Amino acid sequence: DVYGICIDMGRPGVGAYLRDVEKVAMAVAAAGVRFASPKETPLAGVMTDIRSGKIRDDILDVHVLSVIIEGTVKREQLGSVLEAIKSVEKRIDTVFSLGIVSMLSDDDDRPLMETLTRHGIPLPNRGKVNVGLGKPLFSG
């Protein structure tokens, strides 16, 4: 079982340097995040090592409007990822938001909420529900 992770860095008027994006990507990779492939996300296309989150040296000083770090993490490693994000946020000069993607289960995501609380992350007061209309459900 895994959670989807998306870290949306930068905003209009603020942006983000890829150097800061690399710091976050490498921190969460070391904590267990596995990044989406270059076919799935543009950021992976500029990584020299998709396992570590290392970005090409020649573009680290590029300033972008925004960029999303996307991947997955095993449920039992989410706490480590949250701690990595809290640690690296002090070393970057931009804003970011964290998204966690979870399939609703019989336990109403109590383990997710407990993990967030245990690591000092405020519980969300809103969410997005995709009911799967328009596409067949995954049968894989």
List PLM regions with ranges:
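Helix N-cap motif at beta-to-alpha junctions
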Residues: 71-78
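C-terminal interaction module
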Residues: 67-69
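Active-site-proximal beta-alpha loop/turn segments in soluble metabolic enzymes
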Residues: 10
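Residues forming the flavin
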Residues: 7
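Long, contiguous binding/interaction regions
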Residues: 1-4, 13-32, 50, 57-64, ...
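Ser/Thr-rich, low-complexity intrinsically disordered terminal regions
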Residues: 34-58
